[in-house]
Protein backbone atom coordinates (compact mmCIF):
# COMPACT_ATOMS: atom_id res chain seq x y z
CA UNK A 1 0.00 0.00 0.00
CA UNK A 2 2.90 2.37 0.76
CA UNK A 3 4.31 1.95 -2.75
CA UNK A 4 0.89 2.66 -4.24
CA UNK A 5 0.62 5.88 -2.23
CA UNK A 6 4.13 6.91 -3.25
CA UNK A 7 3.21 6.33 -6.88
CA UNK A 8 0.02 8.41 -6.66
CA UNK A 9 1.78 11.25 -4.84
CA UNK A 10 4.52 11.50 -7.45
CA UNK A 11 3.93 14.50 -9.71
CA UNK A 12 3.24 13.49 -13.30
CA UNK A 13 3.15 9.80 -12.41
CA UNK A 14 2.93 7.23 -15.19
CA UNK A 15 0.33 4.46 -15.48
CA UNK A 16 1.13 1.70 -12.99
CA UNK A 17 1.54 -2.03 -13.55
CA UNK A 18 1.36 -4.30 -10.47
CA UNK A 19 2.64 -7.76 -11.35
CA UNK A 20 3.04 -11.02 -9.47
CA UNK A 21 1.78 -14.59 -9.25
CA UNK A 22 -1.93 -15.35 -9.09
CA UNK A 23 -3.64 -15.06 -5.70
CA UNK A 24 -0.85 -13.01 -4.12
CA UNK A 25 -3.25 -10.15 -3.35
CA UNK A 26 -2.78 -7.86 -6.35
CA UNK A 27 -6.45 -7.26 -7.12
CA UNK A 28 -7.48 -6.88 -3.47
CA UNK A 29 -4.65 -4.43 -2.73
CA UNK A 30 -5.22 -2.35 -5.86
CA UNK A 31 -9.00 -2.13 -5.46
CA UNK A 32 -8.72 -1.37 -1.75
CA UNK A 33 -6.26 1.43 -2.53
CA UNK A 34 -8.37 2.72 -5.42
CA UNK A 35 -11.59 2.89 -3.41
CA UNK A 36 -9.85 4.77 -0.60
CA UNK A 37 -8.01 7.27 -2.80
CA UNK A 38 -10.30 8.03 -5.75
CA UNK A 39 -13.86 9.22 -6.12
CA UNK A 40 -14.54 6.86 -9.04
CA UNK A 41 -13.09 3.41 -9.82
CA UNK A 42 -13.63 1.93 -13.28
CA UNK A 43 -12.78 -1.79 -13.19
CA UNK A 44 -12.11 -4.19 -16.07
CA UNK A 45 -11.14 -7.85 -15.64
CA UNK A 46 -9.71 -9.33 -18.84
CA UNK A 47 -9.73 -12.87 -17.41
CA UNK A 48 -13.47 -12.81 -16.71
CA UNK A 49 -14.36 -10.66 -19.73
CA UNK A 50 -11.74 -11.04 -22.49
CA UNK A 51 -13.92 -9.03 -24.90
CA UNK A 52 -12.91 -5.90 -23.01
CA UNK A 53 -9.60 -6.05 -24.90
CA UNK A 54 -11.45 -4.91 -28.04
CA UNK A 55 -11.76 -1.45 -26.46
CA UNK A 56 -8.05 -0.99 -27.13
CA UNK A 57 -8.10 -2.45 -30.67
CA UNK A 58 -9.20 0.73 -32.39
CA UNK A 59 -8.38 4.38 -31.85
CA UNK A 60 -6.23 5.06 -28.80
CA UNK A 61 -7.58 8.55 -28.33
CA UNK A 62 -8.52 8.73 -24.67
CA UNK A 63 -11.94 10.23 -25.33
CA UNK A 64 -12.71 7.30 -27.65
CA UNK A 65 -11.63 4.76 -25.02
CA UNK A 66 -13.72 6.56 -22.39
CA UNK A 67 -16.75 6.56 -24.69
CA UNK A 68 -16.45 2.82 -25.37
CA UNK A 69 -16.00 1.97 -21.70
CA UNK A 70 -18.99 4.13 -20.77
CA UNK A 71 -21.09 2.28 -23.35
CA UNK A 72 -19.93 -1.13 -22.08
CA UNK A 73 -20.15 -0.48 -18.35
CA UNK A 74 -22.93 2.09 -18.08
CA UNK A 75 -23.22 3.66 -14.63
CA UNK A 76 -20.16 1.71 -13.46
CA UNK A 77 -17.95 3.89 -15.65
CA UNK A 78 -17.74 7.46 -14.34
CA UNK A 79 -14.84 9.47 -15.75
CA UNK A 80 -14.01 12.70 -13.93
CA UNK A 81 -10.65 14.36 -14.50
CA UNK A 82 -8.38 13.93 -11.49
CA UNK A 83 -10.96 11.79 -9.65
CA UNK A 84 -11.13 8.56 -11.67
CA UNK A 85 -8.77 5.58 -11.74
CA UNK A 86 -9.06 2.90 -14.41
CA UNK A 87 -8.14 -0.54 -13.02
CA UNK A 88 -7.25 -3.12 -15.67
CA UNK A 89 -7.09 -6.54 -14.03
CA UNK A 90 -5.28 -9.61 -15.43
CA UNK A 91 -3.96 -7.76 -18.47
CA UNK A 92 -2.08 -10.82 -19.70
CA UNK A 93 -5.41 -12.40 -20.61
CA UNK A 94 -6.12 -10.11 -23.56
CA UNK A 95 -7.18 -12.66 -26.19
CA UNK A 96 -5.22 -11.23 -29.12
CA UNK A 97 -1.57 -10.22 -29.23
CA UNK A 98 -2.47 -7.21 -31.33
CA UNK A 99 -4.94 -5.99 -28.74
CA UNK A 100 -2.40 -6.63 -25.99
CA UNK A 101 0.19 -4.58 -27.86
CA UNK A 102 -2.26 -1.75 -28.37
CA UNK A 103 -3.26 -1.98 -24.72
CA UNK A 104 0.31 -1.34 -23.65
CA UNK A 105 0.59 1.45 -26.19
CA UNK A 106 -2.56 2.93 -24.68
CA UNK A 107 -0.75 3.36 -21.38
CA UNK A 108 1.45 5.94 -23.05
CA UNK A 109 -1.60 7.81 -24.30
CA UNK A 110 -3.10 7.87 -20.80
CA UNK A 111 0.17 9.22 -19.44
CA UNK A 112 0.28 12.04 -21.99
CA UNK A 113 -3.41 12.85 -21.51
CA UNK A 114 -3.10 12.97 -17.71
CA UNK A 115 -6.78 13.25 -16.82
CA UNK A 116 -7.21 9.73 -15.46
CA UNK A 117 -4.91 7.40 -13.56
CA UNK A 118 -4.45 3.83 -14.79
CA UNK A 119 -3.45 0.78 -12.73
CA UNK A 120 -3.02 -2.60 -14.37
CA UNK A 121 -2.43 -5.96 -12.70
CA UNK A 122 -0.88 -8.99 -14.33
CA UNK A 123 0.09 -12.53 -13.40
CA UNK A 124 3.38 -13.95 -14.69
CA UNK A 125 4.02 -10.98 -16.95
CA UNK A 126 7.35 -11.47 -18.67
CA UNK A 127 7.28 -15.27 -18.31
CA UNK A 128 8.07 -16.69 -21.75
CA UNK A 129 5.21 -18.63 -23.29
CA UNK A 130 2.56 -17.39 -20.85
CA UNK A 131 -0.31 -15.19 -21.93
CA UNK A 132 -0.27 -12.75 -24.84
CA UNK A 133 2.27 -10.23 -23.64
CA UNK A 134 3.69 -8.08 -26.45
CA UNK A 135 7.33 -8.48 -27.40
CA UNK A 136 8.12 -4.94 -26.29
CA UNK A 137 6.59 -2.26 -24.10
CA UNK A 138 7.26 1.42 -24.85
CA UNK A 139 10.15 2.59 -22.71
CA UNK A 140 9.10 5.05 -20.03
CA UNK A 141 5.35 4.53 -20.51
CA UNK A 142 4.70 2.80 -17.18
CA UNK A 143 5.82 2.26 -13.60
CA UNK A 144 6.09 -1.37 -12.46
CA UNK A 145 5.64 -2.72 -8.92
CA UNK A 146 6.31 -6.38 -8.17
CA UNK A 147 4.04 -7.99 -5.56
CA UNK A 148 4.96 -11.15 -3.70
CA UNK A 149 3.23 -13.52 -1.24
CA UNK A 150 3.68 -12.76 2.46
CA UNK A 151 7.11 -13.60 3.82
CA UNK A 152 7.62 -15.12 7.28
CA UNK A 153 7.95 -11.74 8.98
CA UNK A 154 4.62 -10.61 7.52
CA UNK A 155 3.11 -13.95 8.56
CA UNK A 156 4.24 -13.20 12.12
CA UNK A 157 2.58 -9.78 12.02
CA UNK A 158 -0.65 -11.35 10.73
CA UNK A 159 -0.59 -13.74 13.69
CA UNK A 160 -0.27 -10.99 16.27
CA UNK A 161 3.50 -10.91 16.77
CA UNK A 162 4.33 -7.25 17.29
CA UNK A 163 7.07 -5.36 15.45
CA UNK A 164 9.16 -4.88 18.64
CA UNK A 165 9.18 -8.66 19.16
CA UNK A 166 10.15 -9.25 15.53
CA UNK A 167 12.91 -6.66 15.85
CA UNK A 168 14.20 -8.35 19.01
CA UNK A 169 14.23 -11.72 17.25
CA UNK A 170 16.12 -10.24 14.31
CA UNK A 171 18.68 -8.68 16.65
CA UNK A 172 19.18 -12.01 18.45
CA UNK A 173 19.53 -13.81 15.14
CA UNK A 174 22.13 -11.34 13.88
CA UNK A 175 24.09 -11.61 17.15
CA UNK A 176 23.60 -15.40 17.29
CA UNK A 177 22.32 -15.15 20.86
CA UNK A 178 19.55 -17.35 22.35
CA UNK A 179 16.02 -16.15 23.04
CA UNK A 180 13.74 -17.29 25.89
CA UNK A 181 12.65 -20.90 25.43
CA UNK A 182 8.94 -20.06 25.39
CA UNK A 183 9.48 -17.56 22.56
CA UNK A 184 11.72 -20.00 20.71
CA UNK A 185 9.04 -22.70 20.88
CA UNK A 186 6.38 -20.29 19.68
CA UNK A 187 8.53 -19.27 16.69
CA UNK A 188 9.12 -22.93 15.79
CA UNK A 189 5.38 -23.50 15.88
CA UNK A 190 4.70 -20.50 13.66
CA UNK A 191 7.45 -21.48 11.23
CA UNK A 192 5.92 -24.94 10.81
CA UNK A 193 2.50 -23.35 10.30
CA UNK A 194 3.94 -20.96 7.71
CA UNK A 195 5.51 -23.92 5.88
CA UNK A 196 2.03 -25.43 5.52
CA UNK A 197 -0.11 -22.30 5.08
CA UNK A 198 2.30 -20.41 2.83
CA UNK A 199 2.11 -16.71 2.07
CA UNK A 200 -0.96 -16.33 -0.13
CA UNK A 201 -3.19 -13.69 1.52
CA UNK A 202 -6.42 -15.73 1.34
CA UNK A 203 -4.77 -18.73 2.97
CA UNK A 204 -3.13 -16.64 5.68
CA UNK A 205 -6.36 -14.78 6.47
CA UNK A 206 -8.29 -18.05 6.66
CA UNK A 207 -5.72 -19.48 9.05
CA UNK A 208 -5.70 -16.34 11.21
CA UNK A 209 -9.50 -16.36 11.40
CA UNK A 210 -10.06 -20.08 11.95
CA UNK A 211 -6.75 -21.56 13.16
CA UNK A 212 -7.89 -24.68 11.31
CA UNK A 213 -5.55 -26.24 8.75
CA UNK A 214 -8.41 -28.12 7.09
CA UNK A 215 -10.04 -24.76 6.31
CA UNK A 216 -6.80 -23.54 4.73
CA UNK A 217 -6.44 -26.68 2.62
CA UNK A 218 -9.88 -26.09 1.10
CA UNK A 219 -8.71 -22.85 -0.54
Feature-to-residue mapping (PLM):
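Short regulatory helix/loop adjacent to the ATP-binding pocket of P-loop NTPases
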Residues: 126-142, 156-161
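Sensor-1/coupling segment of RecA-like P-loop NTPase cores
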Residues: 111-134
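Pre-Walker A adenine-sensing motif
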Residues: 1-11
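Conserved lysine of the Walker
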Residues: 26
Amino acid sequence: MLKLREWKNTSGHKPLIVKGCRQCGKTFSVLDFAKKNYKHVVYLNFFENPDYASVFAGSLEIDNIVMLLSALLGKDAVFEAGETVLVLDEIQDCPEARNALKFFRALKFFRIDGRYDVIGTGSLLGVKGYGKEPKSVPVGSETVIDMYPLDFEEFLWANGISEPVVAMLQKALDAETPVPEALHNRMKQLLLQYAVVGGMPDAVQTFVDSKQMDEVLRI
